[in-house]
């Protein structure tokens, strides 16, 4: 296992900026608004040939609102999980009550944990002098640094990695995990869904929309298959996106879909399918990802034996050409159909990478052409000679014909429907390409 380093501190001291500086990428959301990183976020890093995991946490503060209490609990969990801790403060705002509370907590409760005390935003000689007063926290060897320009960070990393055990190297060149992006509008139950699967309070969960702003990876194994769940902030309507945090969160949703094999799109059963849900689904379809639609909070719906059929028919009437997407009714609260959802997602992943022999495809083509003959266009007849599958990350089929311009949309839809039925391609977009031969 790679050693785990946790970044802790009160809100807005620059933890996410330091996180990005160490990893040399814009992974955690960075904003001047206090408390922007509200959950734990773990990413792999490397320094001087040594590998580690870096965890960015929500800010620890003494406020008594529900979100602050959850952030405190998450920070404590992060400290317990970590091999060592970077305790970050801000020289520009000076030592605060929350800084001193964190200092006491670390020295009393976690005295056996390696703590690296850092003072951030030390970017001038005067600020260096000001930073000297931070020894009153009880940490006698503070690191003066600037996460923004990188000064002092290398020295701290040298000492941290020197103190940690070597990571165990494993051969993970061939990643066989199934990557699932858990996406949807705010407050549809994405984090509750992930927590129910993992059996742990891994994410902050409350009824306040947007309590998960960053995308966070969690791994678990089911039936000897490893899964990576990428939980994201909900994608909001543009009118609700603030300049700053919500923009980055929406971008994170898009990036999560880019990384995944299957986009698991959650709906709130009470709200039904909205334009924003279709936007997320279309985003996944355009990127040629598998898609699974989960109608969450089904336990809150009054129903009889026909309710799910009526509900699904209504959904599909609004989905247009996306009828190939499987729909499941779940409850993250009662765990109804949770594992069925994972099994279906795994099946979709297999469908997406399915390879079909050319001989099987041409037998299919022969049967399809005998059932429906392509209509003529401008007096010209479409003649398809053969077909094959093109090597790609999703199913792409090439049809070699006399003139691609003669292919009409209804015939294209017919072939796509029959391909799905014949070769088990539910849940994945497929591409048909007609080429002149």
Curated annotation (Swiss-Prot):
NCBIfam families noted in UniProt: GTPase_EngA (TIGR03594), small_GTP (TIGR00231)
Physiological role: GTPase that plays an essential role in the late steps of ribosome biogenesis.
Assembly with partners or alone: Associates with the 50S ribosomal subunit.
GO biological-process terms attached to the record: ribosome biogenesis
Identification of the protein by name: GTPase Der
Protein family per UniProt: Belongs to the TRAFAC class TrmE-Era-EngA-EngB-Septin-like GTPase superfamily. EngA (Der) GTPase family.
CDD domains named in the record: EngA1, EngA2
GO molecular function list: ATP hydrolysis activity; GTP binding; ribosome binding
Binding site for GTP 1: 9-16, 56-60, 120-123
Keyword Nucleotide-binding: yes
Keyword tRNA processing annotated: no
């Amino acid at each position: 296992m790679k050693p785990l380093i946790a970044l802790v501190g009160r809100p807005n001291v620059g933890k996410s900026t330091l996180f990005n500086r160490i990893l040399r990428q814009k992974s955690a959301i960075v904003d001047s608004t206090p408390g922007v990183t509200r959950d734990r976020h773990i990413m792999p890093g490397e320094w001087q040939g040594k590998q580690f995991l870096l965890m960015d946490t929500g800010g620890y503060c003494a406020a008594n609102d529900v979100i602050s209490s959850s952030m405190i609990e998450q920070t404590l969990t992060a400290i317990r999980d970590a091999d060592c801790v970077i305790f970050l403060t801000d020289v520009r705002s000076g030592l605060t009550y929350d800084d001193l509370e964190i200092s006491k907590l670390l020295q009393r409760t976690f005295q056996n944990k390696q703590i690296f005390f850092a003072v951030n935003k030390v970017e001038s000689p005067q600020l260096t002098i000001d930073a000297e007063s931070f020894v009153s926290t009880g940490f006698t060897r503070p690191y003066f640094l600037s996460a923004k320009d990188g000064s002092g960070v290398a020295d701290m990393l040298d000492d941290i990695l020197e103190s940690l055990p070597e990571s165990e190297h494993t051969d993970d060149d061939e990643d066989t995990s199934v990557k699932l992006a858990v996406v949807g509008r705010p407050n549809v139950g994405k984090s509750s869904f992930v927590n129910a699967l993992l059996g742990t309070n891994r994410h902050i969960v409350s009824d306040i929309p947007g309590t998960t702003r960053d995308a966070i990876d969690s791994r678990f194994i089911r039936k000897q298959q490893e899964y990576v769940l990428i939980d994201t902030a909900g994608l909001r309507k543009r009118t609700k996106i603030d300049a700053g945090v919500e923009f980055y969160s929406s971008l994170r949703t898009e990036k999560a879909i880019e990384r995944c094999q299957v986009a698991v799109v959650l709906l709130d059963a009470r709200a039904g399918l909205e334009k924003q849900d279709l936007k997320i689904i279309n985003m996944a379809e355009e990127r040629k990802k598998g898609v699974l639609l989960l109608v969450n909070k089904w336990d809150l719906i009054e129903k009889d034996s026909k309710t799910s059929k009526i509900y699904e028919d209504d959904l599909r009437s609004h989905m247009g050409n996306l009828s190939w997407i499987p729909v499941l009714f779940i409850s993250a609260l009662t765990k109804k159909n949770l594992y069925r959802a994972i099994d279906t997602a795994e099946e979709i992943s297999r469908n997406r990478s399915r390879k079909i022999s050319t001989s099987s495809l041409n037998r299919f083509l022969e049967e399809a052409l005998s059932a429906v003959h392509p209509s003529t266009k401008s007096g010209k007849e479409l003649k398809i000679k053969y077909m094959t599958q093109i090597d790609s990350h999703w199913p792409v089929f090439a049809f070699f014909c006399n003139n691609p311009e003669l292919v009409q949309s209804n015939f294209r839809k017919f072939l796509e429907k029959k391909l799905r039925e014949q070769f088990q391609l539910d849940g994945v977009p497929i591409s048909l390409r007609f080429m002149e031969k």
